[in-house]
Amino acid sequence: MAAILARKSLSALRSRQLVLAGHTIEGTNGYNRTLLGTRSFATKHSFSTDKDDEEREQLAKELSKDWNSVFERSINTLFLTEMVRGLMLTLKYFFEKKVTINYPFEKGPLSPRFRGEHALRRYATGEERCIACKLCEAICPAQAITIEAEEREDGSRRTTRYDIDMTKCIYCGFCQEACPVDAIVEGPNFEFATETHEELLYDKEKLLENGDRWETEIAENLRSESLYR
């Protein structure tokens, strides 16, 4: 609609210019000169016709865009369409399965590779797995592990001291990867916050206690990951 009005206004403007030019020439040289002047004026100014058309059409497009934006804003304001779209999205997710977990009463599943609180494991006979090779102590980047060992009567080596400073540990899992007998592992527990620093200094008894508590779960996790180690 705006484009049609623009073209009509342009045609009216051209006609008026031609008429004014014809009247000016007629006053001096008569009717024949009027026609000649009209044709000359039209010929002289014909080069600007295409340019004017382009300008008018561009203006019409801009006006059309402006009116469309005004119309859209008016509709949104009048009928509150944005709020309706938001409510529709809310209703869509209202009936879908909830993804929120009400922690700590609900807990999500943990990966078998989860690295949590440390533990020392035993064999089924009750014998400690650790052979005091000190590979875990050597590989620990945080230097959080301290081991002391001695030789037993049968010639085997066993630890007399196995300490982990949990405030230094970065839970990289290198100790577990380095252990040749799967003695030191990182268990599934992540809720071991304490009120004092001393409670985070784990000794051998504490680590063995953790291993006895989670042995079933730890063994299952190691079994499921055995193909990828």
From Swiss-Prot:
Residues 1-41 form a transit peptide. Its main location: mitochondrion. [4Fe-4S] cluster 2 binds at C140, C169, C172, C175. It is found in: Mitochondrion inner membrane. SUPFAM superfamilies: 4Fe-4S ferredoxins (SSF54862). Binds 2 [4Fe-4S] clusters per subunit. It catalyses: a ubiquinone + NADH + 5 H(+)(in) = a ubiquinol + NAD(+) + 4 H(+)(out). It is an enzyme of class 7 (translocase). PANTHER family: NADH DEHYDROGENASE [UBIQUINONE] IRON-SULFUR PROTEIN 8, MITOCHONDRIAL (PTHR10849:SF20), NADH DEHYDROGENASE UBIQUINONE IRON-SULFUR PROTEIN 8, MITOCHONDRIAL (PTHR10849). This is NADH dehydrogenase [ubiquinone] iron-sulfur protein 8, mitochondrial. It comes from Solanum tuberosum.
